[in-house]
Amino acid sequence: MKIWVDADACPGVIREILFRAAQRTGVALTLVANQPVKVPPSPHIRSLQVSAGFDVADNEIVRRVSAGDLVITSDIPLAAEVIAKGGHALSPRGELHTRENIGARLNMRDFMDTLRASGIQSGGPPALNQKDRQAFANQLDRLLAKR
């Protein structure tokens, strides 16, 4: 198992949890972004900078991910592509996307996009809180234990 991170939108506190997990377990962790990302010196952790552009980082993750790999992303369409390739997708809030729930999440995302396009302000998600961080760490530990 390798861990791929959609790093352009990944909160710093989640990155720190991932850094510690990679050091502890020795699993390969790659942060993919269209800007430079600082990573601690480690043989298990690296960053991959891609060119700027719409979905460039997402497309690079999809190109590189293999069955059984884990992708950290809040991007629902990216999560769907990862699942289709046999990977696991986990949001920074600790929500595990699966074959069983990704369709409903894609539908909700599309519905919210339609609302925003029609001028209805739906607001963004609330700030990441301690409960979210704990849910992420717990789900990450469960996935790493299964590898």
Curated annotation (Swiss-Prot):
PANTHER family given in the database record: UPF0178 PROTEIN YAII
Protein name: UPF0178 protein Tgr7_2584
Xref: InterPro entries: UPF0178
Pfam families, sorted: DUF188 (PF02639)
Domain of life: Bacteria
Protein family (similarity comment): Belongs to the UPF0178 family.
